[in-house]
A protein has these predicted regions:
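Juxtamembrane intracellular "pre-TM" segments in multi-pass secondary transporters
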Residues: 2-7, 191-218
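Residue-level signature of mid-helix packing/kink "hotspots" within the transmembrane helices
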Residues: 30, 58-66, 150-151, 258-262, ...
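Extracytoplasmic gate region of multi-pass secondary transporters
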Residues: 32-33, 212-266, 327, 331
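Helix-breaking motifs and short loop linkers at transmembrane-helix boundaries and internal kinks
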Residues: 44, 76, 97-103, 131, ...
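Conserved MFS/SLC helix-loop-helix module at the cytosolic interface between two early adjacent transmembrane helices
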Residues: 63-99
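Cytoplasmic helix-loop-helix junction between adjacent transmembrane helices
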Residues: 107-146
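Helix-loop-helix hairpin linking two adjacent transmembrane segments in secondary transporters
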Residues: 142-188
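A late C-terminal transmembrane helix in Major Facilitator Superfamily
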Residues: 335-371
Length: 406
């Protein structure tokens, strides 16, 4: 596999391209989250309605992830990613024409469907182009574009908003998608990217919903990483209303929480590869790291109790750092019990289940924001990852899994 991609640096180009596409996808989806205080004020939408708009994206994203996973596993990366990014680029621009609940929800749902290919494409690329002992870091690179996009969105989009308004910001997101499609037209000519794996010849079963390991994976991914969605979609509203910060100020500081997400991908990816090289029980190594994630995630409950913007941003940073650990380690767990033939579907199930959890919770948390029950919202968002960790401990117990030793 290494020889197909040329030298050491060239080997990482496909993963780097997936970093770029996940970065763009998160700029696209976070533009609404960043500008929510202004958009809600100008359109008259409530926090609960905003939650339903987020849910429209999340439901479509949830349904699309396993679909794109199957498409990418069978039709290949080149065609699958070209179709997906073309779809979401059009949907992103459609936000510029929205003005109410239903138009925003429709544009958001179309965006969610297209972006459902992001993480299946990233994992498919990593397992197809990198050797096994580099896949933890490769996954961190491919997936970290999302967290990097969340970091960069306020820094890039805020000036565009100040110059051309929130509708102009959505036009900009469409142009970024077109730029990536041009890059992909070149990178996807590489033989290891163009290759279509013949999944049908695999002798190992893929993920099935009656398999306890699938539910263990879903618990970690969907519930453990839920604070990422909560912070992404609610941080601007929390800073604007109870803390009284302006849209311009929010744009200057909202990169701080997702920086924890970005750093978490790199740290947890490195720790995962380090644990793999040590050998021993994969499950025990994952259990130790997941315990660290669970303990660290508890500090998020303090957010509504601390004074000042700086303290709030620090706690959000730590929450996203811990949540990224749940995400990386859940994928490492799934890759240890299923073969690379099912990589796209694995990523699709994980990201889809996370999106389903966000779709269920955001209207509820949005309603709590409407009635100023901020403490309850943060405490619920803190408790959910602990439930995911406990669920994984129960469902992944050795001796009940079969297959590989995890």
């Amino acid at each position: 596999m290494a020889s197909e991609g040329g030298g050491t640096i060239a080997r990482w180009v496909p993963a780097g391209t997936m970093l770029a596409v996940s970065l763009i996808s998160y700029i696209d989806r976070n533009t609404l989250a960043l500008l929510a205080p202004t958009i809600l004020r100008e359109t008259g939408l409530s926090g609960e309605q905003y939650g339903f708009i987020i849910a429209a994206f999340s439901i479509a994203y949830c349904m699309a992830n396993p679909v794109w996973g199957k498409i990418l596993d069978r039709a290949g990366l080149r065609r699958g990613m070209t179709l997906a990014v073309s779809c979401w680029t059009v949907a992103s621009v459609a936000h510029a024409f929205a003005g109410g609940l239903w138009s925003f929800a429709a544009a958001r749902a179309a965006l969610g469907f297209g972006e459902g290919a992001t993480f299946p494409g990233g994992l498919r690329t990593v397992v197809q182009t990198l050797p096994e002992d580099r896949r933890g870091r490769g996954l961190a690179v491919a997936y970290s574009g999302g967290s990097l996009g969340a970091v960069l969105t306020p820094l890039i989009v805020t000036p565009i908003f100040l110059w051309w308004g929130w509708r102009g910001a959505f036009w900009f997101t469409g142009f970024t998608g077109l730029a990536w499609l041009g890059l992909w037209a070149v990178v996807s000519k590489r033989p290891e990217v163009r290759r279509v794996r013949q999944v049908a010849v695999s002798n190992t079963p893929g993920p099935r919903m009656r398999d306890r390991r699938v539910w263990a994976y879903i618990c970690l991914y969907a519930l453990g990483a839920l604070p990422i969605g909560f912070v992404l979609y609610s941080a601007s509203l929390y800073l604007a209303h109870p803390l009284g910060r302006s849209q311009a100020f929010i744009g200057k500081v909202l990169w701080i929480p997702p920086l924890g997400w970005e750093m978490g991908y790199l740290v947890w990816g490195w720790l995962t590869d380090r644990g793999l090289r040590k050998g021993g029980s994969r499950r025990e190594s994952l259990r130790r790291m997941l315990t660290w994630c669970a303990v660290l995630s508890l500090v998020f409950a303090l957010t509504p109790l601390v004074p000042g913007t700086v303290s709030v941003l620090v706690l959000m940073f730590l929450a996203m750092f811990a949540a990224s650990g749940f995400l990386v380690l859940s994928v490492a767990y799934a890759n240890s019990v299923y073969t690379a033939d099912h990589a796209g579907l694995i990523a699709g199930v994980g990201a889809g289940s996370w999106s389903a959890a966000v779709a269920v919770m955001m209207p509820i948390l949005g309603r709590l924001f409407d009635v100023h029950a901020y403490a309850a919202a943060f405490w619920i968002a803190t408790a959910i990852p602990m439930c995911g960790f406990v669920g994984w401990l129960v469902l992944s117990r050795e001796g009940e899994l079969g297959g590989k030793d995890v």
